[in-house]
Amino acid sequence: MSSIKSSEVVRSTIVDTWRWMWPDILMRILPMAVIPFLYIAILHLPLAFLGLTWGDVPVQLATGLLVGICMAAFATMWRMFIVGPWFRWPTIGDHFLQGFFYLFINAPVEELFFRGLVWGAVTQWTGWIGWGWLASTAAYTLYHRLGKWSWRSVGGVGLAGLVFSLIYLAQPTPRSLLAVIIVHGFTTAGFLSWGDEVMYRRWKRGHGE
Protein backbone atom coordinates (compact mmCIF):
# COMPACT_ATOMS: atom_id res chain seq x y z
CA MET A 1 0.00 0.00 0.00
CA SER A 2 1.07 3.59 -0.64
CA SER A 3 0.32 6.77 1.28
CA ILE A 4 0.44 10.45 0.45
CA LYS A 5 3.94 10.54 1.97
CA SER A 6 5.27 7.45 0.15
CA SER A 7 8.11 7.90 -2.31
CA GLU A 8 6.69 5.26 -4.68
CA VAL A 9 3.19 4.16 -5.68
CA VAL A 10 1.92 0.60 -5.40
CA ARG A 11 -0.31 -0.41 -8.33
CA SER A 12 -3.44 -2.55 -8.29
CA THR A 13 -3.79 -4.72 -11.41
CA ILE A 14 -6.46 -7.01 -12.85
CA VAL A 15 -4.51 -9.97 -11.48
CA ASP A 16 -4.52 -8.45 -7.98
CA THR A 17 -8.24 -7.73 -8.09
CA TRP A 18 -9.18 -11.10 -9.57
CA ARG A 19 -7.25 -12.80 -6.77
CA TRP A 20 -9.76 -11.56 -4.18
CA MET A 21 -12.77 -11.19 -6.47
CA TRP A 22 -13.38 -14.77 -7.57
CA PRO A 23 -13.49 -16.27 -4.05
CA ASP A 24 -15.68 -13.33 -2.98
CA ILE A 25 -18.12 -14.15 -5.78
CA LEU A 26 -18.21 -17.83 -4.83
CA MET A 27 -18.44 -17.46 -1.05
CA ARG A 28 -20.45 -14.24 -0.65
CA ILE A 29 -22.10 -13.01 -3.84
CA LEU A 30 -23.65 -16.28 -5.02
CA PRO A 31 -25.23 -17.28 -1.66
CA MET A 32 -26.58 -13.76 -1.13
CA ALA A 33 -28.06 -13.79 -4.63
CA VAL A 34 -29.70 -17.21 -4.28
CA ILE A 35 -31.22 -16.97 -0.78
CA PRO A 36 -33.75 -14.19 -1.59
CA PHE A 37 -35.13 -16.16 -4.52
CA LEU A 38 -35.38 -19.32 -2.43
CA TYR A 39 -37.35 -17.36 0.17
CA ILE A 40 -39.95 -16.03 -2.25
CA ALA A 41 -40.14 -19.39 -4.05
CA ILE A 42 -40.89 -21.25 -0.81
CA LEU A 43 -43.48 -18.70 0.33
CA HIS A 44 -44.89 -18.12 -3.17
CA LEU A 45 -44.24 -14.38 -3.09
CA PRO A 46 -43.94 -12.07 -6.13
CA LEU A 47 -40.66 -10.58 -7.32
CA ALA A 48 -41.97 -7.19 -6.19
CA PHE A 49 -41.56 -8.43 -2.60
CA LEU A 50 -37.80 -8.11 -3.15
CA GLY A 51 -38.03 -4.71 -4.84
CA LEU A 52 -37.59 -6.27 -8.27
CA THR A 53 -39.85 -3.88 -10.15
CA TRP A 54 -38.91 -1.14 -12.60
CA GLY A 55 -40.95 1.63 -10.99
CA ASP A 56 -40.85 4.99 -12.78
CA VAL A 57 -37.68 4.32 -14.77
CA PRO A 58 -36.78 7.95 -15.67
CA VAL A 59 -37.18 8.99 -12.03
CA GLN A 60 -35.25 5.94 -10.83
CA LEU A 61 -32.37 6.65 -13.22
CA ALA A 62 -32.27 10.39 -12.48
CA THR A 63 -32.38 9.83 -8.73
CA GLY A 64 -29.77 7.10 -8.92
CA LEU A 65 -27.34 9.15 -10.98
CA LEU A 66 -27.75 12.46 -9.13
CA VAL A 67 -27.55 10.99 -5.64
CA GLY A 68 -24.97 8.44 -6.78
CA ILE A 69 -22.52 11.09 -7.97
CA CYS A 70 -22.88 12.95 -4.67
CA MET A 71 -22.40 9.74 -2.69
CA ALA A 72 -19.33 8.78 -4.74
CA ALA A 73 -17.79 12.13 -3.82
CA PHE A 74 -18.77 11.63 -0.17
CA ALA A 75 -17.27 8.12 -0.14
CA THR A 76 -14.03 9.36 -1.67
CA MET A 77 -13.72 12.12 0.93
CA TRP A 78 -14.52 9.70 3.76
CA ARG A 79 -11.85 7.34 2.46
CA MET A 80 -9.24 10.11 2.25
CA PHE A 81 -9.87 12.03 5.45
CA ILE A 82 -11.53 9.60 7.87
CA VAL A 83 -10.30 6.11 7.01
CA GLY A 84 -6.71 7.04 6.23
CA PRO A 85 -4.17 7.89 3.54
CA TRP A 86 -3.36 4.39 2.27
CA PHE A 87 -4.12 3.50 -1.35
CA ARG A 88 -3.21 1.31 -4.32
CA TRP A 89 -3.38 3.00 -7.72
CA PRO A 90 -5.48 0.84 -10.10
CA THR A 91 -4.45 0.33 -13.70
CA ILE A 92 -6.98 1.35 -16.37
CA GLY A 93 -8.04 -2.27 -16.84
CA ASP A 94 -8.36 -2.74 -13.11
CA HIS A 95 -10.57 0.36 -12.85
CA PHE A 96 -12.92 -1.16 -15.43
CA LEU A 97 -12.96 -4.55 -13.71
CA GLN A 98 -13.58 -3.09 -10.26
CA GLY A 99 -16.17 -0.65 -11.59
CA PHE A 100 -18.08 -3.42 -13.33
CA PHE A 101 -18.05 -5.54 -10.18
CA TYR A 102 -19.18 -2.76 -7.85
CA LEU A 103 -21.87 -1.38 -10.17
CA PHE A 104 -23.31 -4.50 -11.79
CA ILE A 105 -22.61 -7.37 -9.38
CA ASN A 106 -21.93 -6.27 -5.81
CA ALA A 107 -24.50 -3.45 -5.54
CA PRO A 108 -27.43 -5.40 -7.06
CA VAL A 109 -26.76 -8.46 -4.90
CA GLU A 110 -26.28 -6.56 -1.63
CA GLU A 111 -29.42 -4.52 -2.25
CA LEU A 112 -31.38 -7.63 -3.21
CA PHE A 113 -30.36 -9.26 0.07
CA PHE A 114 -30.56 -6.38 2.54
CA ARG A 115 -33.12 -3.89 1.18
CA GLY A 116 -34.99 -6.67 -0.62
CA LEU A 117 -35.01 -9.79 1.55
CA VAL A 118 -34.13 -8.57 5.05
CA TRP A 119 -36.29 -5.44 4.82
CA GLY A 120 -39.21 -7.34 3.29
CA ALA A 121 -39.02 -10.38 5.55
CA VAL A 122 -38.71 -8.46 8.82
CA THR A 123 -41.55 -6.15 7.79
CA GLN A 124 -43.63 -9.21 6.91
CA TRP A 125 -42.89 -10.93 10.23
CA THR A 126 -43.41 -7.88 12.47
CA GLY A 127 -46.09 -6.01 10.55
CA TRP A 128 -44.18 -2.71 10.79
CA ILE A 129 -41.93 -1.27 8.10
CA GLY A 130 -39.83 0.50 10.74
CA TRP A 131 -38.46 -2.81 11.97
CA GLY A 132 -37.67 -3.81 8.40
CA TRP A 133 -35.82 -0.54 7.86
CA LEU A 134 -33.89 -0.85 11.13
CA ALA A 135 -32.95 -4.52 10.68
CA SER A 136 -31.84 -4.14 7.07
CA THR A 137 -29.77 -1.02 7.74
CA ALA A 138 -28.11 -2.47 10.85
CA ALA A 139 -27.42 -5.82 9.19
CA TYR A 140 -25.97 -4.14 6.09
CA THR A 141 -23.70 -1.96 8.21
CA LEU A 142 -22.43 -4.57 10.65
CA TYR A 143 -21.89 -7.35 8.13
CA HIS A 144 -18.94 -5.40 6.77
CA ARG A 145 -17.10 -6.28 9.97
CA LEU A 146 -17.10 -9.87 8.70
CA GLY A 147 -14.76 -8.63 5.99
CA LYS A 148 -12.52 -7.14 8.70
CA TRP A 149 -13.32 -3.57 7.72
CA SER A 150 -12.15 -0.99 10.25
CA TRP A 151 -14.75 0.73 12.42
CA ARG A 152 -14.03 3.99 10.61
CA SER A 153 -14.91 2.30 7.34
CA VAL A 154 -17.99 0.69 8.90
CA GLY A 155 -19.09 4.12 10.13
CA GLY A 156 -19.05 5.36 6.55
CA VAL A 157 -20.98 2.27 5.47
CA GLY A 158 -23.59 3.04 8.11
CA LEU A 159 -24.09 6.58 6.84
CA ALA A 160 -24.31 5.32 3.26
CA GLY A 161 -26.77 2.63 4.36
CA LEU A 162 -29.05 5.30 5.82
CA VAL A 163 -29.10 7.07 2.45
CA PHE A 164 -29.83 3.83 0.58
CA SER A 165 -32.68 3.02 2.97
CA LEU A 166 -34.19 6.51 2.74
CA ILE A 167 -34.21 6.34 -1.06
CA TYR A 168 -36.03 3.01 -0.86
CA LEU A 169 -38.40 4.12 1.90
CA ALA A 170 -39.40 7.33 0.11
CA GLN A 171 -40.81 5.46 -2.89
CA PRO A 172 -44.45 4.56 -3.43
CA THR A 173 -45.28 0.87 -3.30
CA PRO A 174 -44.33 -1.39 -4.91
CA ARG A 175 -40.84 -0.05 -4.26
CA SER A 176 -38.04 -0.50 -6.78
CA LEU A 177 -34.39 -1.23 -6.01
CA LEU A 178 -33.18 0.35 -9.26
CA ALA A 179 -32.26 3.81 -7.92
CA VAL A 180 -30.83 2.33 -4.72
CA ILE A 181 -28.63 -0.07 -6.70
CA ILE A 182 -27.24 2.78 -8.81
CA VAL A 183 -26.47 4.90 -5.74
CA HIS A 184 -24.96 1.91 -3.95
CA GLY A 185 -22.73 1.08 -6.92
CA PHE A 186 -21.44 4.63 -7.25
CA THR A 187 -20.79 4.84 -3.51
CA THR A 188 -18.80 1.62 -3.37
CA ALA A 189 -16.81 2.48 -6.48
CA GLY A 190 -16.06 5.90 -5.01
CA PHE A 191 -14.80 4.35 -1.80
CA LEU A 192 -12.86 1.36 -3.11
CA SER A 193 -11.74 2.32 -6.63
CA TRP A 194 -12.19 5.94 -7.67
CA GLY A 195 -10.97 7.05 -4.25
CA ASP A 196 -7.64 5.38 -4.99
CA GLU A 197 -7.39 7.40 -8.20
CA VAL A 198 -8.08 10.67 -6.38
CA MET A 199 -5.53 9.82 -3.70
CA TYR A 200 -2.97 9.03 -6.38
CA ARG A 201 -3.60 12.43 -7.98
CA ARG A 202 -3.02 14.08 -4.60
CA TRP A 203 0.19 12.08 -4.20
CA LYS A 204 1.31 13.15 -7.67
CA ARG A 205 0.72 16.84 -6.94
CA GLY A 206 2.51 16.51 -3.61
CA HIS A 207 5.57 15.07 -5.34
CA GLY A 208 5.58 17.67 -8.10
CA GLU A 209 4.97 15.18 -10.93
For each feature predicted by the language model, list its residue ranges.
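Hydrophobic alpha-helical transmembrane segments
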Residues: 26, 61-65, 100, 130-135, ...
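Juxtamembrane helix-loop-helix connectors linking adjacent transmembrane helices
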Residues: 12-24, 44-109, 119-125, 201-208
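Membrane-interface helix/loop boundary segments of multi-pass membrane proteins
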Residues: 90, 110-135, 169-175
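C-terminal ends of transmembrane helices
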Residues: 74-88, 140-150, 192-193
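Functionally important transmembrane alpha-helices
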Residues: 33, 149-209
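Active-site His/Glu-centered metal-binding helix of metallohydrolases
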Residues: 108-113, 117-118, 122, 142, ...
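Aromatic-anchored segments of alpha-helical transmembrane domains
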Residues: 37-40, 137-146, 162-166, 189-190
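Small-polar-interrupted transmembrane alpha-helices in polytopic inner-membrane proteins
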Residues: 71-72, 103, 129-145, 158-161
